[in-house]
C-alpha cells in the first residue's frame, strides 16, 4: 500500500488556492475568516 499523500503543486493550487477560494461563496467566507483571525498565509 502506498502513502496517501502524493504531492502535486497543480492539484494543490486547484483545490486549495486563492483563486479557487474566491470562486465560491464558501471559499470567500473561508478567506474572510482567515483574514479576521490574522493569518499571514490566506491560502495554499
UniProtKB/Swiss-Prot annotation:
Transferase among the record's keywords?
no
Pfam families the UniProt entry points to: Ribosomal_L34
Q: Which Gene3D superfamilies match?
A: 1.10.287.3980
The family database entries (InterPro entries) matched by this protein are listed as: Ribosomal_bL34, Ribosomal_bL34_CS
Q: Which GO terms describe its biological process?
A: translation
Show the segment(s) annotated as Disordered: 1-44
Q: Which GO terms describe its molecular function?
A: structural constituent of ribosome
Q: Among the entry's GO cellular component annotations, what is one?
A: ribonucleoprotein complex
- Annotated Basic residues bias: 9-19, 31-44
Q: Which cysteines are joined by disulfide bonds?
A: none
Alphabetically sorted, this entry's keywords are: Ribonucleoprotein, Ribosomal protein
Cited PANTHER family = LARGE RIBOSOMAL SUBUNIT PROTEIN BL34M, MITOCHONDRIAL RIBOSOMAL PROTEIN 34 FAMILY MEMBER
Q: Which family does it belong to?
A: Belongs to the bacterial ribosomal protein bL34 family.
What's this protein's name? Large ribosomal subunit protein bL34
Where does this protein come from, organism-wise? Lachnospira eligens (strain ATCC 27750 / DSM 3376 / VPI C15-48 / C15-B4) (Eubacterium eligens)
Amino acid at each position: 500500500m502506498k502513502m496517501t499523500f502524493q504531492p502535486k503543486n497543480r492539484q494543490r493550487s486547484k483545490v486549495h488556492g486563492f483563486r479557487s477560494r474566491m470562486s465560491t461563496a464558501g471559499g470567500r467566507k473561508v478567506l474572510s475568516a482567515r483574514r479576521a483571525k490574522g493569518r499571514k498565509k490566506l491560502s495554499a
